[in-house]
């Protein structure tokens, strides 16, 4: 196979492997839920089904994760707790994985330590509007240079808009000297060693590039609105919000 046929063959194999993993997870979760039911533990158990991120399956021409587009940025979250959450209820508020620990402490009647980020999700369980809940989220990917060669970028997401800034110096060594300690037996070890052996240097240029998306109108994020007529006010507001996050989180540019 060559050309398009080879690409399609690789993609189909990739999808099949991915779906097999999903089926395995589904089966294992089902076994766990069955055990809880059989031992009458379901009503007194908090079940959280989530992930560390979403995943690309060809969207935007990508696989894997890392970029701030919705397919990776938007993560699954299902919580079952019969004592406090009505079955089939939904919540559209913005939450983060850093909210999990405060939530578990809150449900256990324990106070969140001052140093711990995040907010308890318990106020959202009733399905009622919650005052003073967050209206935006911040994202930052900074692991460049690395063998993924995904450029540094950060951004903010509100209910309607998303601003992404790709930034940083290019032309750097993909595997800086002594940055990585290769662990024998790991799947990534061969890649680090290979890049070191060929003294790999990226040909990426310096970058300072914005992307702006209207999530309501363009949920697939296919049309970059940055610099388009009529978007100046939104750009200004989103840039201001990004600057606030960077300052509060002490982000190095």
Show the residue positions of the predicted features.
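Histidine-centered active-site microenvironments of extracellular/periplasmic hydrolases
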Residues: 34-87, 96, 117
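Short beta-strand segments
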Residues: 46-51, 78-79, 136-142, 164-165
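Polar, surface-exposed loop/tail segments
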Residues: 42-45, 87-156, 231-241, 253
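C-terminal, low-complexity/hydrophilic appendages and adjacent surface loops
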Residues: 70-73, 143-227
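Active-site rim elements
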Residues: 7-20, 64, 84-95, 107-112, ...
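A long, amphipathic alpha-helix that forms part
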Residues: 3-45, 107
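Beta-strand elements within well-structured catalytic alpha/beta cores of enzymes
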Residues: 18, 22-25, 29, 46-51, ...
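Long, internal low-complexity/basic segments
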Residues: 1-13, 21, 25, 193-211, ...
